[in-house]
Regions:
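A generic structural signal for alpha->beta connector loops
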Residues: 1, 34, 144-147
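Rossmann-fold NAD(P)-binding glycine/threonine-rich loop
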Residues: 7-36
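Glycine- and other small-residue-rich loops at beta-strand/loop junctions that grip anionic moieties
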Residues: 8, 15, 40-44, 127
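Short-chain dehydrogenase/reductase
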Residues: 20, 42-45, 49, 128-132
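Adenosine-phosphate binding glycine-rich loop
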Residues: 26-73
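C-terminal catalytic/substrate-binding lobe primarily of soluble NAD(P)-dependent oxidoreductases
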Residues: 58-189
Length: 189
């Protein structure tokens, strides 16, 4: 075996869904083999967990409500560009939303919950509740949390292009036949 480092989370090729429980299931085997696995050591997840731990230790007696906000104010100068691996980003943004409240996971339709949030130095941006993997580890490791949500910003042009990609079937993750060849649309895109 070997040690393992993951900046995000495992996501199966055939399902637009991910969760830490799949990787946490390996903990005892890694420990027995004397191996280390570090999950979620990117920015979100990763730095977001460090910020939460720092706030819990230095600023609060307990954390009850946690909203993580991810605002990308960048401009690629293109009509449609993702800020992460395009396939993973499209899968992440088009799946159902999920957040934690009162000991339960609440599932929403994609982009169902949104509002304008003010970001210092950037201004107001429309922000959407999406599911992001660090919510799982944060509610597990900070049991006083009553509600945890992850918000991400998207411009209307981005969302319009995303809807077109979905409507023409290019966000699909199941194989289709194209000119006698089997392809999976989203990686082909």
């Amino acid at each position: 075996g070997c040690n393992y480092l993951d900046t995000a989370n495992y996501e199966p090729k055939d399902e637009a869904h991910f969760e830490y429980s799949w990787q946490w299931a390996y903990q005892d085997r890694f420990k027995a083999a004397g191996l280390t696995a570090i999950l979620g050591c990117g920015f979100d997840p990763g730095v977001t967990a460090i910020f939460t731990a720092y706030a819990a230790k230095h600023h609060f007696d307990e954390i009850h409500y946690l909203d993580i906000v991810d605002c990308n104010a960048g401009n690629h100068g293109m009509a449609f560009a993702t800020n992460f691996n395009p396939e993973i980003n499209i899968r992440e943004v088009t799946q159902k939303g999920r957040y934690y409240e009162n000991g339960k996971w609440v599932t929403t339709e994609p982009h169902e919950i949104h509002k304008g949030l003010h970001y210092p130095g950037i201004g107001e941006r429309e922000s959407y509740v999406i599911y992001h993997e660090e919510l799982e580890s944060l509610v597990k490791n900070f049991p006083t949390i009553r509600r945890a949500r992850f918000w991400m910003t998207f411009g209307q042009e981005y969302l319009t292009h995303l809807r077109v990609i979905q409507n023409i079937g290019m966000a699909r993750i199941d194989p289709i036949m194209y000119n006698g060849v089997e392809i999976v649309p989203i990686p082909f895109l």
